[in-house]
Structure formats: C-alpha cells, structure tokens
Amino acid sequence: MDSDHNHINGDLAHGFENMVCVRCNDGFSMQDQMVNSSGQVWHSECFVCAQCFEPFPDGIYFEYEGRKYCEHDFHVLFSPCCGKCNEFIVGRVIKAMNASWHPGCFCCEICNKQLADVGFLRNAGRALCRECNEREKAAGHGRYVCHKCHAMIDDGQHIKFRGDSFHPYHFKCKRCNNELTTASREVNGELYCLRCHDTMGIPICGACHRPIEERVIAALGKHWHVEHFVCSVCEKPFLGHRHYERKGLPYCEQHFHKLFGNLCFKCGDPCCGEVFQALQKTWCVKCFSCSFCDKKLDQKTKFYEFDMKPTCKRCYDRFPTELKKRISESLKDRDVENQRRSMSPGPK
C-alpha cells in the first residue's frame, strides 16, 4: 500500500511540474491552490480582474477577447450607457437617436409609450410614437417644438436657451423677475429681459450681434468674440495675431499685402524693406535666386529669363543650343510686340 501511495503522489507531483500559471508563468507545488478555467490554470491569488487586479467578487467574472474582468470593470469598459437613466445596459440594447437605451427607457417623448417593439418616428429631434407624430404634424408642420412642454411654437415666437428652443413665457428675467418675451438675452447661462440686459453694459459682438461673455476684441470701433474677429478674405480668426485695416475691413497680413502691397513671388510672404523687382514680379532680397540651382542673385549679377523666372548664367549655358535659340527668338518677338504697343495711339 505504501508503495502504491508513493507512486500516486509521484504522478501528481510530475503533473504539477508540467503546469504553469497563465498570469505569473510560475509552476505549482502540491500545496498551492489552483483555479482551472477554460482549460487554463492560475494560482488562486493570480486569478484576478485584468483591469483592477482585484479578486472577482463572489467568483463572478466576464470574459472578453480572452481576458477576464470583474462585473464593474466589464461594464465600464464595454457596456453602453442608457441615454435616459445613464445606467449600464446589460442584455438587450436599443440603438436609436445617436444613443443607446434600455428597452424600457426608450419611450415616446410626449406620451411615454415604450417604442422598442413598435418603432418610432423622428420629429424635431425627438423620438415619437406614430400617433403623437401625426398629431404634431397636424398641429403645425416645420415649426419649433418647445423643449419644456413639447408643444409647437408659433412662427417667430421662440427663444433659444442653452441650444434648445422654448416658449419665452416658461422663463422669468434673472434680474427683474418679469416674464420674458422673444426679446430676451442669454448672458452667462442666465436669461434677462431686453431692458435689464441693456443696463448691464455687456458688449455686443459686431459679427453675430450676441452678448460677449468671455474674452472680447475691440477693433474697428466695435467689439467682437475672439472667434468672430476674422480676415474679411479668408475668414480665419486672428487669435491675437496682427491684423490690418482698410476701409473699415480687417485683413490678415498675407491678404492685405496681396491686395494692397507686395508679396514675394518665391516664399509668398509680404516683402519688407528692400525688394527686387524683375520679370514683372517682386522678390525678397533673400529669395531672389536662380530657379534651377538656387544660387543667390543680386542687382549686379547677370541672369537670364526662362519661363518668366530668373536663371543664372552657369545654368543657362548648360541649356541645349536649340533651346537657347528659341528663348532668344521668343524674347526678341516679345520686345518687338511691346515696342509696337507703346507706339500705338491710344483710344480716342
């Protein structure tokens, strides 16, 4: 019997030697507690959540792409949140209106009828059942819907508050407590009647004509939102960079010089200080160079014209003879034409 017992223990020990923990890659001894799951083995202390590295409460875990997670971390990482109750969704998910929903939470926004199994219709950004949608269409097609009472708003009788449309009578002025009209104004997340607003001294943007609540730009005799003070050509915000004014309009440096000054033909930047003018173009001093070898040229350097660009003598001499001949003939023809035009009488 002792011989048989020793033989069994030896087989078990040999079996443990061939097993390795999935997490720590260490082996097992006869005294180690072991967890076996899906044909893989762990030390009991290694069998933990892949996210928080804590043991699984009540031994419950969820597996995703070969990794095991506790219930909390699995929901945080992979479960969608309901668009109504903001709780994690386990089981059936309804995807609609650019959000996910519990089946019991996806309801008509007017009558609260569940829509998961009967379908819905989109109306002014709302999910409605067929009956409510028909009533809304009959009440007034294409009009705003009040975000508070969900009723249609007569044309021209809505106000915007935090991005949504409302009947103005749902609100009172923050300062005088009078019921608001369509002439109300929103400032720092609060609504004011027009009279109270005008006494607050808040600047109005010269572009969008709305109050400026944060940083303000003062230019051209007006006030502007930072993002609304833009070049009148490219419409890019100046964002604190230098701007140029002409006849009451703002311009960025590039478009101001393009319209009213000189831009370097090569680099495209406005020319400042000394410039080179040749071939009906303007260059910065540092940019006036051979169009082939990029050798810097100056007023004393002899250059040739090729394709309306400057070419140094060394590069020009490398041109084929036939090409140089055609260039010379073309320049002569152009000079003759220019001379003829200069001698022609102007229109009477």
Swiss-Prot record:
InterPro entries the UniProt entry points to: LIMS1/2-like_LIM1, PINCH-1-4-like, PINCH-1/2-like, Znf_LIM
Function: Component of an integrin containing attachment complex, which is required for muscle development and maintenance. Probably function in adherens junction. Affects the structural integrity of the integrin containing muscle adherens junctions and contributes to the mechanosensory functions of touch neurons.
Protein name, entry field: LIM domain-containing protein unc-97
Keywords of this entry: Cell junction, LIM domain, Metal-binding, Nucleus, Repeat, Zinc
LIM zinc-binding domain segment(s): 21-73, 82-132, 146-196, 205-255, 264-315
Keyword Membrane attributed: no
GO cellular component terms listed in the entry, alphabetical order: adherens junction; basal plasma membrane; cell-cell junction; cytoplasm; focal adhesion; M band; nucleoplasm; nucleus
GO molecular function, one term: myosin binding
Subunit relationships: Interacts with unc-98. Component of an integrin containing attachment complex, composed of at least pat-2, pat-3, pat-4, pat-6, unc-52, unc-97 and unc-112.
Cell location: Cell junction, Adherens junction; Nucleus
Recorded phenotype for the gene knockout or disruption: RNAi-mediated knockdown results in impaired mobility, mitochondrial fragmentation and disrupted integrin attachment complexes in muscle. This leads to degradation of muscle proteins in the cytosol, myofibrillar defects and disruption of sarcomere organization.
Keyword field contains Mitochondrion: no
Tissues in which the UniProt entry reports expression: Restricted to tissue types that attach to the hypodermis, specifically body wall muscles, vulval muscles, and mechanosensory neurons.
Gene Ontology biological process terms in this record: cell-cell adhesion; cell-cell junction organization; mitochondrion organization; muscle cell cellular homeostasis; muscle organ development; positive regulation of integrin-mediated signaling pathway; positive regulation of locomotion; positive regulation of sarcomere organization
Pfam families: LIM (PF00412)
Organism encoding this protein: Caenorhabditis elegans
